[in-house]
Regions:
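Pyridoxal 5′-phosphate
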Residues: 1-399
Length: 399
């Protein structure tokens, strides 16, 4: 536990899968860059110019890659567009894209747009229960018409973790490129993108990496694709040594750096710079082990005290991500009532609560208190429904 490394919000914070709390090192890094701007003006670009590249070794450690295979840039959706513009090349029968019906909507928007643009279709792997996916169903949909498969490492609603290695290997054996959205896993567990043969991946840094709202996302391209020119070139992806020659000919940077497009936000990148320092002396294996301990405790407490609540997150460790999804009546109302009691969780329509005990800062005692309060709120909600008394309602505003 590194709780003292963070400026923790009041109460019990169980929403790190939406937005992690602010590390003190992130504040310090942003303030340092602000001072540079104030004191040096444009001359500070001498230091800022390759800031993203200097963060690549730390990013590489998070996802199991070499530094040249990763870069901090853009957002998840913008990076997905850049990857699709590069690697989605319909050819004869092999012209369709594959995703799942449980993917985060923004991914599906991007995938469908490229399929429509290039004359393909977006095929969706169905869920048997509306919460989880079967590996066998994913493999069965890796058919000869699929050019590229795009999948989440961890499902954003239920918290199910998919088998990246097995699915990637199966796709590769069938000549299908595989890409992954790792938004709900990076920072919560180790990854092996290079060794697993993942073709490309994206993720955010504002959840488990705690780099702040709108933090630069991450992008991975396996070095087996070295030499592939980005489909959405921009001047920040130009070879750094000759970028300011201002040539009209695009000469891509080495590796994933070529997929940068425009000038980055230095202040947002600075927050990421500070947030990554928190992980310098942390074992990702230890973070994962602690996460599983905490989610085990939470699931056991729910089983014991909340019999009317269904746990929709897999109980098997190998299939579980970092958050626990609870299905219950009046979930939206309950999530708001929790916040009134200084317990921050979140809601997903129509009836899911997501609670995230994060290894770096949450404790068993917090989980015990949260479930005790949940018990009180569920009892009160049942009484309210019995008397047809309305309660507060509001849409969620976080991912």
């Amino acid at each position: 536990v590194k709780r003292d490394a963070f400026a923790m919000p009041k109460g019990i914070y169980l929403d790190g899968n939406s937005l992690g709390p602010m590390p003190h090192l992130a504040r310090a890094a942003v303030e340092r860059r602000l001072r540079q701007w104030a004191q040096e003006g444009v001359n500070a670009w001498e230091d800022w110019f390759d800031l993203a590249e200097r963060l690549s070794p730390a990013l590489a450690r998070l996802v199991g890659a070499s530094a040249s295979e990763v870069v901090a840039t853009g957002s998840i959706t913008a990076n997905l567009h850049a990857l699709l513009a590069t690697f989605y090349r319909p050819d004869g029968e092999r012209r369709n894209l594959l995703a799942t019906e449980l993917d985060f909507p923004s991914d599906l928007y991007a995938l469908r747009a490229w399929a429509e643009r290039l004359g393909g279709e977006l095929r969706l792997v169905p869920s048997r229960d509306g919460h989880s996916l079967e590996t066998r169903d994913i493999l069965a949909n890796l058919t000869p018409d699929i050019a590229l498969a795009w999948l989440p490492t961890v499902l954003y609603r239920s918290g199910q973790r998919l088998d990246v290695r097995a699915i990637t290997a199966a796709a590769g054996a069938r000549g299908i490129l595989s890409g992954w959205d790792a938004a709900h896993s990076v920072g919560a567990m180790p990854h092996r993108f290079h060794d697993d043969g993942v073709d490309f991946a994206v993720w955010c840094h504002y959840k488990y990496v705690n780099a702040g709202p709108g933090a630069p996302a991450g992008l991975f391209v396996h070095d087996k694709h070295t030499g592939v020119r980005p489909g959405l070139p921009g001047w920040w992806g130009h070879d750094k040594a000759s970028q300011f020659e201002m040539s009209s000919d695009f000469r891509p940077a080495e590796g994933a750096g070529a997929f940068q497009i425009g000038t980055p936000s230095i202040l947002a990148t600075a927050a990421l710079e500070g947030a990554l320092e928190v992980f310098e002396n942390c074992s990702l294996e230890a973070i994962r082990a602690r996460s599983l301990e905490l989610t085990d405790v939470l699931i056991a407490l729910v089983d014991e005290q909340l019999p009317e609540v269904s746990v929709r997150t897999p109980r098997q460790h190998e299939a579980r991500g970092g958050h626990v999804a609870l299905e219950c009546r009046s979930a939206r109302r309950i999530s708001l009532a929790l916040r009134e009691r200084n317990i921050t969780a979140d809601f997903r329509p129509p009836n899911l609560l997501r609670l995230t005990p994060v290894a770096l800062y949450n404790t068993e005692a917090e989980l015990e208190e949260a479930v005790t309060v949940l018990r009180e709120l569920l009892t009160a909600s049942a009484r309210r429904e019995a008397t047809n008394s309305p309660g507060k309602d509001a849409p969620p505003r976080v991912t």
